[in-house]
């Protein structure tokens, strides 16, 4: 579900501009300020000019770039995904 939504966001033919995701961080605590096991409301955008995903918390406090869908999916477990945040 998560990988599919990210790939759709990355697709140049997609009309989806961003995703709003409720997810639990499964990466290492301290990585860009995120805490393992903590749930976050995220806004994810794919920046074509940089070739990467940019993830920020809805409140704008935390930010992390990801080069691939695999890298993002490795660090997050999504419980809800909504297009067009």
Question: What do the predicted segments below correspond to?
Answer:
Residues 1-20, 24-28:
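Mixed-charge, Lys/Arg-rich low-complexity intrinsically disordered regions
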Residues 24-68:
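Basic/aromatic-rich interaction segments and small domains that mediate binding to polyanionic partners
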Residues 61-85:
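Intrinsically disordered, low-complexity, charged/polar segments
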